[in-house]
């Protein structure tokens, strides 16, 4: 039978069995190596309230803690929520990670502090 992907959609090599995890979105059981993993780092408070909390804080340079959360999606939920997308047969051969968005350099960001011309 023909196969669609070289790794059969999994990251399991030379292992007979891997543990199952539950999908963050729907609760479906999915093998840990097949699940789509996404690591999310967020501020505890939203951006609008950061300045208010900084003004009200007793400490001058208090760094607000962040929330670190690892999300596990089954394939159906990852496609539905657009974490991953369908790719053509030629594009499936490309094993490079997708380009990262939102990570611009400090110099390229408009309004960033820096040397004045």
Swiss-Prot record:
Composition bias type Low complexity, residue spans? 101-111
GO BP, sorted A to Z: cytoplasmic translation; determination of adult lifespan
Which cellular components does GO assign to this protein?
Answer: cytoplasmic side of rough endoplasmic reticulum membrane; cytosolic small ribosomal subunit; ribosome
Signal sequence, start to end: none
Q: Which GO terms describe its molecular function?
A: mRNA binding; structural constituent of ribosome
Q: What's the short name of a Pfam family annotated to this entry?
A: Ribosomal_S26e
List locations, semicolon-separated.
Answer: Cytoplasm, Cytosol; Cytoplasm; Rough endoplasmic reticulum
Q: Where is the composition biased (Basic and acidic residues)?
A: 87-97
The cross-references to InterPro entries, in alphabetical order and at most eight, read: Ribosomal_eS26, Ribosomal_eS26_CS, Ribosomal_eS26_sf
PROSITE patterns hit by this protein: RIBOSOMAL_S26E (PS00733)
**Keyword field contains Endoplasmic reticulum:** yes
Chain intervals for the UniProt region annotation (Disordered): 85-117
Q: Any idea which UniProt keywords this protein has?
A: Cytoplasm, Endoplasmic reticulum, Ribonucleoprotein, Ribosomal protein
Cross-referenced PANTHER family: 40S RIBOSOMAL PROTEIN S26
Subunit and partners: Component of the 40S small ribosomal subunit.
Family membership:
Belongs to the eukaryotic ribosomal protein eS26 family.
Protein name, UniProt field: Small ribosomal subunit protein eS26
* Organism this protein belongs to: Caenorhabditis elegans
């Amino acid at each position: 039978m023909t196969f669609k992907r070289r790794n059969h959609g999994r990251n399991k090599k030379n292992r007979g069995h891997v543990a199952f995890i539950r999908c963050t979105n729907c609760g479906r059981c999915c093998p840990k190596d097949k699940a789509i993993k996404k690591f999310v780092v967020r501020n505890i408070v939203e951006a609008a309230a950061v300045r208010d909390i900084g003004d009200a804080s007793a400490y001058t340079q208090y760094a607000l803690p962040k929330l670190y959360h690892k999300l596990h999606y089954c394939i159906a939920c990852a496609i539905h929520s657009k974490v991953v997308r369908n790719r053509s047969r030629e594009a499936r051969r490309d094993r490079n990670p997708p380009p990262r968005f939102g990570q611009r350099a400090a110099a390229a960001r408009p309004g960033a502090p820096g040397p004045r011309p």
